[in-house]
Curated annotation (Swiss-Prot):
Residues 4-79 form the Carrier domain. The keyword Phosphoprotein applies. GO terms for molecular function: acyl binding; acyl carrier activity. This is Polyketide biosynthesis acyl-carrier-protein AcpK. It comes from Bacillus subtilis (strain 168). Pfam families: PP-binding. Transmembrane segments: none annotated. Pathway: Antibiotic biosynthesis; bacillaene biosynthesis. The gene is acpK. GO terms for cellular component: cytosol; membrane. InterPro entries: ACP-like_sf (IPR036736), PP-bd_ACP (IPR009081). GO terms for biological process: antibiotic biosynthetic process; lipid A biosynthetic process. It is found in: Cytoplasm. The keyword Cytoplasm applies. The modification O-(pantetheine 4'-phosphoryl)serine is found at S39.
Length: 82
């Protein structure tokens, strides 16, 4: 799975949790908080993405990411090492 596909999985789940963002032009620099995701929304998005990618990683490993591009990068690295 390539980085672009992981980014697409991330966007799909963001739009499912935050349907008001459907049609938004997502950029790697976008931050979930700035997009309107509260802590519960962010946890739900992460859980859904991890399930879609069949990953089991501690959430703490994702806590340092600053934007959705960095999140996709970390997830890509985890998929490659799984």
């Amino acid at each position: 799975m390539d980085k672009q596909r992981i980014f697409e999985v991330l966007i799909t789940n963001i739009c499912e949790v935050l349907p008001e963002l459907d049609g938004h032009r997502f950029e790697p620099e976008d931050q979930l908080v700035e997009l309107g995701a509260d802590s519960v929304d962010r946890a739900e998005i992460i859980t859904m993405v991890l399930e879609d990618l069949s990953l089991k990683i501690p959430r703490i490993e994702l806590s340092g990411v600053k934007n959705i591009g960095e999140l996709a990068e970390v997830l890509y690295d985890k998929v490659q090492s799984a």
